[in-house]
Amino acid sequence: MKGSLIIVGFFVLGIIVGVCDVVPAGLLDGDVSYDVLCCLMFCVGISIGCDTSVLKSFKDVNPRLMMLPVMTILGTLAGCAAASLLLGHRQLTDCLAIGSGFGYYSLSSIFITQYRGPELGTIALLANICREILTLLCAPLLVKYFGKLAPISVGGATTMDTTLPIITRCSGESFIIVSIFHGFCVDFSVPFLVTFFCSL
């Protein structure tokens, strides 16, 4: 949760700096968000390439549980489609793009800002931070009422890093590999799904 609060803090700081009009003009003229996005994608690629032990551990995952990331993605998109019916002022593709962040707020919000503008990018940032915080705070209740896979599915792309400790504590150590596999697959889908829905 500390990491989420730091991200929100920088976001608020950026708003304050923008309102106070103290940003150098040259910085605003350039396509800074695109440059940051390229650097972020490069770092994500490095982290996946360097951690080969994670890829090797996936062979121990129960074949039935390999469907969990697919169910998480489909369930999230179905929920976003339903939400778009209630939010008449938002397009279906906007809601699907936001939901396709799956808790990966840093990457998805930059993509959405790039394609659809800062307003939708801000909504994506806050929505995906809320998903992570919901997992961190409600994991015990999710296990109690919906089963041990529930916090993994709710955690989305965060289950291989920030929410892994709470999932391990609530669901048990036997779900560590499942959680990492789930997070890896959902995480991998984010840039493809977000850009797909943003381009529609």
Q: What does each model-identified segment do?
A:
Residues V23, I46-S57, A83-S84, I110, ...:
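C-terminal ends of transmembrane helices
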Residues I15-V19, A78-A82, S108-F111, L137, ...:
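Alpha-helical transmembrane segments of multipass membrane proteins
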Residues S189-L200:
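Juxtamembrane boundary at the C-terminal end of a transmembrane helix
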Residues A81, Q91-L92:
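Alpha-helical transmembrane segments in inner-membrane proteins
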Residues M1-T76, L92-G103:
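Helical membrane-embedded segments and adjacent short helical loop/helix-boundary regions
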Residues T52-A81, G121-I133, V178-V186:
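Entry/N-cap segments of selected transmembrane alpha helices
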Residues T93-I133, F146-F181:
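Alpha-helical membrane segments and immediately flanking helix-loop junctions
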Residues K56-N62, L74, L85-H89, P118, ...:
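Membrane-interface helix-loop junctions in multi-pass transporters/channels
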